[in-house]
């Protein structure tokens, strides 16, 4: 009876745990790698926003993504 319990425990508990794929085993999808096909302006905007910096804009074109140079 003990041997049957060990066999059942092995196949019902340990075997599924061993075959379960954990989150750490998954490949990482990087945002920048997925965005390689962006044009340079969109890429620069993404990099600047990630760095927390804003670009300098000429006075009539100032908006929330940049600050006025003059």
From Swiss-Prot:
One of its GO terms (molecular function) is ion channel inhibitor activity. The keyword Secreted applies. One of its GO terms (cellular component) is extracellular region. It is found in: Secreted. Disulfide bonds join 56-68, 57-66, 62-69. Its main location: secreted. Expressed by the venom duct. Keywords: Cleavage on pair of basic residues, Disulfide bond, Secreted, Signal, Toxin. Residues 1-24 form the signal peptide. It comes from the Eukaryota. The keyword Disulfide bond applies. Residues 25-55 form a propeptide. Belongs to the conotoxin M superfamily. The cysteine framework is III (CC-C-C-CC). Classified in the M-1 branch, since 1 residue stands between the fourth and the fifth cysteine residues. This is Conotoxin Lp3.2. The lineage of its organism: Eukaryota, Metazoa, Spiralia, Lophotrochozoa, Mollusca.
